[in-house]
Curated annotation (Swiss-Prot):
Enzyme class: transferase
Protein name: Acetolactate synthase, mitochondrial
Organism from which the protein derives: Schizosaccharomyces pombe (strain 972 / ATCC 24843)
Pathway: Amino-acid biosynthesis; L-isoleucine biosynthesis; L-isoleucine from 2-oxobutanoate: step 1/4; Amino-acid biosynthesis; L-valine biosynthesis; L-valine from pyruvate: step 1/4
Top-level taxon of the source organism: Eukaryota
GO molecular function, one term: thiamine pyrophosphate binding
Disulfide bonds: none
Gene: ilv1
C-alpha cells in the first residue's frame, strides 16, 4: 500500500476537508528541508494509516498497492476501546475534554447542542464560562489560549450561535491562535432542508479555519476530537471547527471503536528524506552564521512566532545581547524583548518607532523570526529594506526568514535564506553555530541607532492644568504605576488609536503580556479577551485598555464579569470618536468626519448597574490618584477617562510610502 495513497472515493466535502488535507501534508513532507518534519507532519502520516485501516463513515477509501516500493511496515493488529460503549455523544464529548486536559470552556447553549450541555451539567472537571454573546466566547477563548499556550475551547449551538463565532475564528486564523470550536447542528436527517437554525458551518468556516469537519456517526466522535486538538496545535497554530449534529450527540455508542496508532513506522526512504532535510537546515544555518560575521548593521525582527515557545524569548534576549544586535518587534511580538534594554527598538511599522523603521531600512542583515511581513510592518513592499537587498546581491547580508509555516515564507518579502521549522529550534541551532565565530564591532551601528532614538522619540503635547487629559498621558501613568509589578500584569486591548498608544507608550517587558487583535483588527476584542486572560491566569492583574467605540461593541460582557466575579480592570479612553478613522479623515479627506463620532452612555453608571465599581477622570490633576485607586481595587473595576479629541497616533507611515517616510508629531517636524 503506498504512502501517498490517492483518495478514490469521498462522499462529503467534510471528508475531503479532513482527509484531502492529510494527503497534502504527506506530499508536503517529501519536499521538506526541515529537521522538524516528523514533529510537524507526523499527524498526516498517522491519519493516512487510519485511512488505510478503516472503512469510515464517509465511504470506502481505496489505494493502489501494486505500483509502489515506498511502504509502511506492517502494522500490529488493531485494538479496540470499549470505554465509550453505552455512552451518548454528549458524554463522550465530556470524556474527551478530560482526555485533552481542558479546564475551561467558553460558549452559549441552544437546542441543537443540548445533549452536550446536559452531559457536562455540573461537571466537576472543568468550568464553563457563559458570556452574553458567542463572539465574546470566541475572543475569551483566544485570550485564554494566548496566556496558557493551550487551545481555547468554544461550545455553541447551531445557526446564529455558530455564525456569531466566525469573527473570532477568523481573528484566530490571522494571529495563529489555536482554537477548537464545537458547533451544534440540526439532526443529520434534516441537513439541507433549511431546518430551524440550520447553517452550513463546514462551508461557512472553510476559509477561516485550518480544518473543519461534520461528525456524522457517534463512533467517529473521539477520533474527530483528537484530530481537532492535534491540527489546531500543530505547525502554525490556528482554529478548527467540529460540527456536531444533534442526533450524533444524543445517540448511544453500541460497539467498541478502534484504537489507532499515533506514529507510523517509517521505511528507509522516509528516513533518508529526513536526514537530507536535516543536512539542508544545518547548511543554511552555517550560511546565516557566516553572514553574521560579515554584517555591520544587523537587525532582529521578531513576531508572534517567537512567543509560541515560552523558552524562545529568553534565548532571543541572550542571543541579541551576546551578538549586540538590536531587536524590533511586530505588534503581536511585543514582550519578546525587554523594551527597557538599549538594544530594543520597540515596535516596527505604520505606527512603530521612527528609529525601528530607519534601522530596518538601513540594515544590511535582517533576521526575521516568526513574522508574516504583513503590510503594517513593511510599508511599500517594493521600497522595503533596500540596504539588506543590496547586501544580499553582494553576498554580505540579506533577509533571513525563520517561520514554521511554509506559506508565509516568500508570500510578501522574498528572503535571501528561508529557515522553515520551529523558530525556537532554529534559533538554538543558530545560537550554537555562532558561539565560536568572531563578530565585528557594532559600535558605529549602535551609535547611529541611538542618534535616531534621540531624534525620533515617541512624543505628544501634554495637556494643561484643568484640561482633558491626553490619552498618551493615561498610558504613561499606567506604565509608571505598574513598573514594579509588570511580571504580574497582562494587558488586553480593543482595536483603534488606544491600541497603538498602548503599544507605544507602555514599556513591554514580559513575554505574552499583551493580548490584542493583530491581523484582523477586531474592535470589541478587549473586554472578552480580558475575561479569558483572567480565567487563564487568575492571580495576574489583567487590564483591558479600551477605546469608547471598541468597548461599546462588547460592553455587555460587564455582566459576565460580574456573574463570574472575574477581577478584570477596565480602562476606557473616552473621546466620543473613532480616533484611528478620524485621523485618516483629517489627513486625507479634508476633515470630512463621516459617521465617526458617537454619543456614549455614562460608562460609570453602566458599570454601577452591573454591580461593578467605577471611577471617572475628567482632569489631568486627578489622573495619578485615580489610577492608584484603580490598580489597588480588589475585584472588577472600571475607570473611564475623558480624553482630548483629535489626538493622532504618531509616527505614521501613510499608505504607499516606505518605512522611512513617516510623519512625525508636530513638535518634531
Amino acid at each position: 500500500m503506498t504512502v501517498l495513497a490517492p483518495l478514490r472515493r469521498l462522499h462529503t466535502r467534510a471528508a475531503f476537508s479532513s482527509y484531502g488535507r492529510e494527503i497534502a501534508l504527506q506530499k508536503r513532507f517529501l519536499n521538506l528541508n526541515s529537521c522538524s518534519a516528523v514533529r510537524r507532519y507526523g499527524t498526516g502520516f498517522s491519519n493516512n494509516l487510519r485511512i488505510k485501516k478503516l472503512k469510515n463513515a464517509f465511504g470506502v477509501v481505496r489505494a493502489n498497492s501494486t505500483k509502489s516500493t515506498s511502504t509502511v511496515t506492517t502494522a500490529s493488529p488493531i485494538k479496540y476501546d470499549s470505554s465509550f460503549v453505552g455512552k451518548t455523544g454528549g458524554e463522550i464529548f465530556h470524556d474527551m475534554m478530560l482526555k485533552h486536559n481542558v479546564k475551561h470552556v467558553f460558549g452559549y447553549p441552544g437546542g441543537a447542542i443540548l445533549p452536550v450541555f446536559d452531559a457536562i451539567y455540573r461537571s466537576p472537571h472543568f468550568e464553563f464560562i457563559l458570556p452574553r454573546h458567542e463572539q465574546a466566547a470566541g475572543h475569551a477563548a483566544q485570550a485564554y489560549s494566548r496566556v496558557t499556550k493551550k487551545p481555547g475551547v468554544v461550545l455553541v449551538t447551531s445557526g446564529p450561535g455558530a455564525t456569531n463565532v466566525i469573527t473570532p475564528i477568523a481573528d484566530a486564523l490571522a494571529d495563529g491562535t489555536p482554537l477548537v470550536v464545537f458547533s451544534g447542528q440540526v439532526a443529520t436527517s434534516a441537513i439541507g432542508s433549511d431546518a430551524f437554525q440550520e447553517a452550513d458551518m463546514v462551508g461557512i468556516s472553510r476559509s477561516c479555519t485550518k480544518w473543519n469537519v461534520m461528525v456524522k456517526d457517534v463512533a467517529d466522535l473521539p477520533r474527530r476530537i483528537d484530530e481537532a486538538f492535534e491540527i489546531a496545535t500543530s505547525g502554525r497554530p490556528g482554529p478548527v471547527l467540529v460540527d456536531l449534529p444533534k442526533d450524533v450527540t444524543a445517540s448511544v455508542l453500541k460497539e467498541p471503536i478502534p484504537i489507532l496508532s499515533s506514529v507510523p513506522s517509517m521505511n528507509r526512504r522516509m528516513k533518508e528524506v529526513l536526514e537530507e532535510g536535516s543536512k539542508n537546515v544545518t547548511a543554511k544555518i552555517d550560511r546565516v552564521a557566516n553572514l553574521l560575521k560579515l554584517a555591520k548593521k544587523p537587525v532582529i525582527f521578531c513576531g508572534h512566532g517567537v512567543l509560541a515557545n515560552p523558552e524562545c524569548p529568553t534565548l532571543l534576549r541572550k542571543f541579541s545581547e551576546r551578538l549586540q544586535i538590536p531587536v524590533t518587534t511586530s505588534l503581536l511580538g511585543l514582550g519578546a524583548v525587554d523594551e527597557r534594554s538599549d538594544l530594543s527598538l520597540h515596535m516596527l511599522g505604520m505606527h512603530g518607532s521612527g528609529y525601528a523603521n530607519m534601522a530596518m531600512q538601513e540594515a544590511d542583515l535582517i533576521l526575521a523570526l516568526g513574522v508574516r511581513f504583513d503590510d503594517r510592518v513593511t510599508g511599500n513592499v517594493s521600497l522595503f529594506a533596500p540596504q539588506a537587498r543590496l547586501a544580499a546581491a553582494e553576498e554580505r547580508g540579506g533577509i533571513i526568514h525563520f517561520d514554521i509555516s511554509p506559506k508565509n515564507i516568500g508570500k510578501v518579502v522574498q528572503p535571501t535564506e528561508a529557515i522553515e521549522g520551529d523558530v525556537y529550534e532554529s534559533l538554538k541551532l543558530l545560537d550554537s553555530a555562532t558561539k565560536n565565530i568572531k563578530i565585528p564591532s557594532r559600535f558605529d551601528w549602535l551609535s547611529q541607532i541611538q542618534t535616531w532614538k534621540e531624534r525620533f522619540p515617541f512624543t505628544f503635547t501634554r495637556s494643561a492644568p484643568g484640561e482633558l487629559v491626553k490619552p498618551q498621558e493615561v498610558i504613561q501613568e499606567l506604565d509608571k504605576q505598574t513598573s514594579d509589578i509588570k511580571d504580574k500584569v497582562t494587558i488586553t486591548t480593543g482595536v483603534g488609536a488606544h491600541q497603538m498608544w498602548a503599544a507605544t507608550f507602555y514599556r513591554w517587558t514580559k513575554p505574552s503580556s499583551l493580548v490584542t487583535s493583530g491581523g484582523l483588527g477586531t474592535m470589541g476584542f478587549g473586554l472578552p479577551a480580558a475575561i479569558g486572560a483572567s480565567v487563564a491566569a487568575p492571580k495576574d492583574i489583567v487590564i483591558d485598555i479600551d477605546g469608547d467605540a471598541s468597548f461599546s461593541m462588547t460592553g455587555m460582557e460587564l455582566a459576565t464579569v460580574r456573574q463570574f466575579d472575574i477581577p478584570v480592570k477596565i480602562l476606557i479612553l473616552n473621546n466620543e470618536e473613532q480616533g484611528m478613522v478620524t485621523q485618516w479623515q483629517n489627513l486625507f479627506y479634508e476633515k470630512r468626519y463621516s459617521h465617526t463620532h458617537q454619543k456614549n452612555p455614562n460608562f460609570v453608571k453602566l458599570a454601577d448597574a452591573m454591580g461593578i465599581k467605577a471611577l471617572r477622570v475628567e482632569k489631568r490633576e486627578d489622573l495619578a490618584k485615580k489610577m492608584k485607586e484603580f490598580l489597588s481595587t480588589k475585584g472588577p473595576v472600571l475607570m473611564e477617562v475623558l480624553v482630548a479629541q483629535k489626538e493622532h497616533v504618531y509616527p505614521f507611515v501613510p499608505g504607499g510610502k516606505a518605512l522611512h517616510q513617516f510623519i512625525l508629531h508636530e513638535s518634531l517636524s
